[in-house]
């Protein structure tokens, strides 16, 4: 057993209001520059829909993730090394700019410079940020399907409608929608790492964040195909691939990611998970796709187990990280309460951004007699959002974990309603789903009224373990822009150090 730590995230889809604040703040911080105008490290999609880029869940088209061969070994869906090499100069499975959208801005200056005597009102016309030319029509955007925008024929192409009678959902009274915020999953078994010909993508040992070395990247773009979530983008200006970096400078300082910090609905939770690195290959190679969710749970370790703590210390895990794992909201939701579920585990990448499935307005529907009752609780299989749709999205089609999560959230609500409204303790619903009163109270606290320090339990990094500090002693101190050699010469052979240096030692003339 080789223990490693990973900073994971849980998003509570039951509280997401689709405001796109996370997307905008992430965009402003990381991709508001030339070359990545079309890139959104974080975006919020409305489901059902084809998403961004278009039809990203269709792996028959894009060949992302892993497949299990007959001999039980894993191989990238896009092929082995020889097949990858054969496509290196012409990759047929790469999404084009039209699968994303042509980024644009508006000629706002025209509103100021238009002549006064014009018979028509001046307008700000769209202009392409790629060609610089005016666009006759905006064909697409990063959230083109927002709030079920578009006809049902296009929404019905959503891959999560597989094994569902989707024709009935084209009728207005049967429509449903939910928001799905997406970012890089920072997988335990990332396919992008395996498909990069340059070896530029790596997974950090201390926190599990997957990064692209910009010095090694050669722009082959195989990683874009290899990533089944299509969360790697090609910077056409620099010729490099870029992706969500999980705001690692903030994570190293013990702070949450930008998207988590600015989330209006407070739906995001960050925490540390300890896992057995030796068990990853065995879990990802599970034969039945529906078993992948449980196999990934088996990879995670109990941070309160004395044997796990002892082995973690031997493997170099700092004590502060172990303590953070013991308080991790991600561990509680994924492992203890089993409310959070992984996004498309059938891709076999073992994703580390998990989701709490959304509840439809089930109680009001039950009170109106539109839903049947299954004991104490309303029948969750009659939800407006089909359970099979959620299962296709979160558990490779297995409805049992989804039903368990929905019933537990519903039981918690039933218990708290009886406590706060009726003034009595009713544990029948909790007993039905296998929860204790203490667990129900804790679930309520985390999902409804959690404080900042409860939602984000992120230990600061230990730089002293990453780099020896002693050789830096008596190194480069303060200089006047002349490097570390201590001279104050005005000349430099390469004219690099002193080009912008300010001569602060010269005397200034007194003012008259």
Regions found by a protein language model. Give the residues of each.
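Non-ligating segments of multi-cofactor redox enzymes
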Residues: 1-512
